[in-house]
Regions:
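An N-terminally biased module of ancient metal coordination in phosphate/nucleic-acid-related enzymes
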Residues: 1-88, 149, 197
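Charged catalytic cores and adjacent phosphate/nucleic-acid-binding surfaces used
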Residues: 1-6, 10, 20-26, 89-103, ...
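Surface-exposed amphipathic alpha-helices with a cationic face
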Residues: 3, 29, 70-74, 116-130, ...
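Short, solvent-exposed loop/turn segments at secondary-structure boundaries
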Residues: 15-19, 50, 106-108, 165-168
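Conserved beta-strand positions in the central sheet of alpha/beta enzyme cores
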Residues: 36-38, 130-131, 155
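Short, well-ordered beta-to-alpha junction loops that form the rim of enzyme active sites
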Residues: 41, 85, 132-135, 191-193
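Short beta->alpha connector loops
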Residues: 86-88, 110-113, 134-138
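Active-site-adjacent beta->alpha loops and helix N-cap segments on the catalytic face
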Residues: 111-120, 166, 170-174
Length: 234
């Protein structure tokens, strides 16, 4: 089996993260991971990227954490993939199989369009979407928002749901599992890691190596993904 982290943040792109992309790559390699997906918060959430720059420059800065992790990963033998954590009304969605060029070409879609228009376009053009921690409760989340017909999978285990910041309540994961089962949505998992101290054996196991994000989607669709419980470090 192969182990991957599907949900992590870097200090280059997310204000809530405190470890760089390169540091994250080294730490995950040391922890026995075969690869990671860098999913920094986009501009509608906790981004480090200034608002007053040209769009293309903003995207360049946004991708720095991933690019630094990728460079380090190539040196140490860790596969590194790109993702985006996109937010609407406090609900977070992990977008995969899109790249920097696509982000640069879709400012309107990412910043102004209705969320279902974005989701539809992402999926229609080869990307896929995982609803991250759908039942998390926090001060910045005004209400629970579910999109069962617009996503490809549900993050049924988010290791960081055990963080006291969110009430330290594992029931959020239990509710996510029930939701996925109710709608017949595939399950996946992620640690939602923000620094190297939070690498807690979360993420996923899959039977086949992921060489590109499409390999992850294929294994999601076949039900081959095993979400890992992990254990949040307080």
């Amino acid at each position: 089996m192969y182990k991957y982290e599907t949900h992590l943040h870097t200090s280059e792109g997310s204000t809530c993260a405190s470890s760089s992309g390169a540091e994250m790559a080294r730490a995950h390699k040391a922890a026995g991971y075969d690869g990671i997906f860098v999913t920094d918060h986009f501009f509608n959430s906790s981004t480090t990227v200034p608002k007053d720059l040209p769009w293309e420059k903003r995207i360049d800065l946004y991708c720095k954490g991933y690019e630094n992790a990728l460079e380090e990963g190539r040196k140490i033998g860790l596969d590194v993939f790109f993702g985006v954590e996109w937010t609407i009304n406090g609900a977070d969605f992990l977008i995969y199989n899109k790249d920097k060029a696509w982000l640069k070409d879709n400012e309107h879609l990412l910043m102004e369009a209705d969320e279902r228009e974005l989701f539809n376009e992402v999926r229609k053009t080869g990307g896929f979407i995982v609803h991250a921690h759908p039942f998390r409760e926090a001060s910045y989340i005004p209400h629970i928002s579910l999109y069962p017909h617009d996503v490809d999978a549900v993050e049924v285990i988010n290791t960081r749901n055990s963080d006291p910041l969110f009430g330290g309540n594992d029931c959020y994961n239990d509710r996510a599992k029930a939701y996925a089962a109710m709608y017949g949505l595939p399950e996946t998992g992620g640690s939602d890691t923000h620094n190297t101290e939070q690498i807690v054996n979360g993420g996923i196991l899959v039977p086949e190596r992921i060489n590109e994000p499409a390999d992850y989607l294929r294994q999601i669709k076949t039900g081959s993904v095993i979400p890992l419980e992990g254990s949040f470090k307080k």
